[in-house]
Amino acid sequence: MGTIRYHLCIPHVDGLDEYIKKYPGRVVHSKYYRSPTVYSGQKVLTIGNSASGSDIFNELTKTAHLPVYSSRRRKSPFEGDKPQPGVEWKPIITRYHADGTVEFEDGTTLGAGEVDKIIYATGYRPSFPFWNERANGRPIYDYEVGKLVNTYWHTFFHDLPTLAVVGIEKGLTFRSFEYQAVAVARLFSGRNAIPLPPAREQRRWEEERTEWVKATGKKFHDIESEPGRLGEDSFKWLGYLYRLAGLGTLTGDGRVPPVLSKELLHAVRTIHKYPRYDEDAAGGEVYGYHGGSSTGGKHAAKDWVVVDGL
């Protein structure tokens, strides 16, 4: 299964339901975002500053009415100490008022006339509407805990040996999915280099991972997703899938998981996704990479690397 995170995730806020009814079409999810030109001249509030949210509010600075408001729980580690030009940071929304006012955690507000569109870039929840719990004897996902049930290595199931999931984890996105896909294909075609461990060892892995979650406060399927880090957890995760898959055939059939090259590792460990203010530059200009723009110098765009999904 690869159709995992698809159900829209919009957090509950007091007054949101009434606000949506009063202003139909004003609140949308980033799933339906296609082009910044749709929002030309509009006053936009975006919510969320992970990959999609950041891309959206940065694109909107070229077309929307400025500033573009960006509501977030905290500053992203990808960002500098100040918002980029054209963006104004706001804390989380605490209430939508009946008169159309949007109230934030710090007590500030945006009136009904100050917002034309609100874009929730708040991600997706795992969704398995096709899963027949009665026929399969159990649920596939525990929504209270936030994990696959009876999972091994975020991919396999110790009680369902012919089922696998690709894409539930949060880590080195896309690259890790590719490792999973190759490992699953090898296993199900009988060409895996090493066997899966016995069910009891798979259960032990799940139990130990659960204890790790309790000890660290992290999510079960999160694998070192902070920028600049690709350490023990990531190497164990990808390394096992690599060993399980093994090499392709002598004649070249079968994909080999792409290696973590020195260039990739350097990119991850020195990542800067958005421009930061150069206090030494005239006028406090920004440097770095975004949309191909740069003020030049030693921090020119060519010296920066963009790696999404960490």
Segments from the language model and where they lie:
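Glycine-rich, N-terminal phosphate-binding loop of Rossmann-like dinucleotide-binding domains
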Residues: 1-3, 122-123
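Glycine-rich dinucleotide-binding loop and its adjacent helix/turn
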Residues: 2-59, 66, 83, 146-153
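Glycine/threonine-rich phosphate-binding loop and adjacent beta-strand/alpha-helix elements that clamp
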Residues: 125-189
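Eukaryotic N-terminal targeting leaders
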Residues: 11-26, 75-91, 97-113, 141-144, ...
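C-terminal, flexible cofactor-proximal segment of oxidoreductases
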Residues: 164-310
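Hydrophobic/aromatic beta-strand patches that form the interior of the parallel beta-sheet core
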Residues: 28, 45, 69-71, 119, ...
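Cofactor-binding loop segments of dinucleotide-utilizing enzymes, especially the Rossmann-like FAD-
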Residues: 49, 73, 168
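A Rossmann-like FAD-binding core segment of flavoenzymes
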Residues: 61-143, 187-243, 247-250, 254-255
